[in-house]
């Protein structure tokens, strides 16, 4: 019996073939230099009679095998009215490399009895699996539904891969239809509005250095003119968040405020403690002055202790790691942009160091053996000449026997509220020694993943919080302090700050306290800071713009399109909109479409429709028809208001 297995990337095909073939696979050329065919024998497929030994060929694609586009001859740039593209037929297309990969799949499928898909286990992976199946059928029409299986896996640990081969499922056609829906809508909306915007703004921008140079790469782009103003259903809401912050800063009007502050000497250590006014601050100077003078006249420099609290407090360990948290925290802590961190995580996954990095799940299944993963972090790396990671001793301490003095023992991670039912949270699979073949960025991302995982498997940090409340005449002031008693997870997770503060004065209830200093102070409200990538990731995730796996791509695209640029200020990197980016957002706002392109609502509704398709509550045909009709209506209104876009561009350019 012959089985053809196809992975999404050659690195996965190579790793899986080594495991299933017991290290005895042989490789041969596929016709495309970056894809190999791996041949081996394997027994254990459930469809093989009595678990018989099967001849297996493992190969791969390189991402999507096909694309869709309009016919260049009839619907290329300038060859048709733009609005015709809302109804124009779509053709399946392949570039030269995809054709070579497709030929290999057809050739290998000719003698195959079964096809097993080993693409990534997400929505996009299901669609790529379907593309593979369609190509395999062209090589062997006998490969129908019953002959197609789908391996379900989330990392490249040996036993996990063997279980995936022995317990396959079927392709999820609902997910396939959802991705097909998204691809068609993005193409029709993207090309129609890209051509309209480009033709409208081309003359304005022809000599501007602010234009992107990738027109030939963008579907629907004009190969003869790189001055393309592209539209994307996710990129515009992403741009909208950045422009909104920019305008809040630009239009900010500072306000002066006033407040009262007390300082009390701490006789135990010779220091001082500052007590903050419970009213915070007020914007009326006369009111604050009245409170201040009343207190001085009534109580002088004496306050009274009216409340004294001391209670245990906890700093919770982090929840298990999702894709969004990985990108957000790598941007915040490691100064890596979302694309850098996700690309590094992908490579670590392909090399077998971490689990699949595209997941919304923040809950580990209770049946999962996490202690064995902690043990691997504690082990010496045999390939690294006895080298240990900086956190190996911490991992070992989590596994110490119960009768040791260490209170920080292994504890099953907290459970979040998300479970995509496809992949567990991101976690390390094997330890990474000093000599591992990884880049510096990959090593930093691995360290973050490993430390985050160990923090999840640790005890919460424990401390004692104290609050001291004083009455100064009719006004109340308070000071708080913290003593950290057990650091626990903080010892392995340096990005969480929780430190012991200055000791509060030791005072008794109702005691009278001499005030060393009582001041009425002034301050000024400050504008928000420019948008950071970490903040943008959180906003996109909260508002349903893109998926955990595509957020990085959308942020990258608005910079490639030159709608946004990154600026480094000190250690922080901020995102600032360009003149073109601001004018596009304000231009569409001035046109007044029913659903603003720069707001998240329209794309969020589309993501909800795609989810309904995945759940079987909506069909591809209905969703495509409904959303394309909306875009058709918006296109006609935009086309009728083209001059508005030009006027807004001039206005924005003059103001910046």
UniProtKB/Swiss-Prot annotation:
Residues 172-635 form the Topo IA-type catalytic domain. Its EC number is 5.6.2.1. InterPro entries: Topo_IA (IPR000380), Topo_IA_2 (IPR003601), Topo_IA_AS (IPR023406), Topo_IA_cen (IPR013497), Topo_IA_cen_sub1 (IPR013824), Topo_IA_cen_sub2 (IPR013825), Topo_IA_cen_sub3 (IPR013826), Topo_IA_core_domain (IPR023405). One of its GO terms (cellular component) is nucleus. SMART domains: TOP1Ac, TOP1Bc, TOPRIM. Residues 2-156 form the Toprim domain. GO terms for molecular function: DNA binding; DNA topoisomerase activity; DNA topoisomerase type I (single strand cut, ATP-independent) activity; RNA topoisomerase activity. The active site is at residue 356. Keywords: DNA-binding, Isomerase, Topoisomerase. It comes from the Eukaryota. One of its GO terms (biological process) is double-strand break repair via homologous recombination. It catalyses: ATP-independent breakage of single-stranded DNA, followed by passage and rejoining. PROSITE patterns: TOPO_IA_1 (PS00396), TOPO_IA_2 (PS52039), TOPRIM (PS50880). Belongs to the type IA topoisomerase family. Present with 468 molecules/cell in log phase SD medium. Releases the supercoiling and torsional tension of DNA introduced during the DNA replication and transcription by transiently cleaving and rejoining one strand of the DNA duplex. Introduces a single-strand break via transesterification at a target site in duplex DNA. The scissile phosphodiester is attacked by the catalytic tyrosine of the enzyme, resulting in the formation of a DNA-(5'-phosphotyrosyl)-enzyme intermediate and the expulsion of a 3'-OH DNA strand. The free DNA strand than undergoes passage around the unbroken strand thus removing DNA supercoils. Forms a complex with SGS1 and RMI1. Interacts with SGS1. PANTHER family: DNA TOPOISOMERASE 3-ALPHA, PROKARYOTIC DNA TOPOISOMERASE. This is DNA topoisomerase 3. It comes from Saccharomyces cerevisiae (strain ATCC 204508 / S288c) (Baker's yeast). The lineage of its organism: Eukaryota, Fungi, Dikarya, Ascomycota, Saccharomycotina.
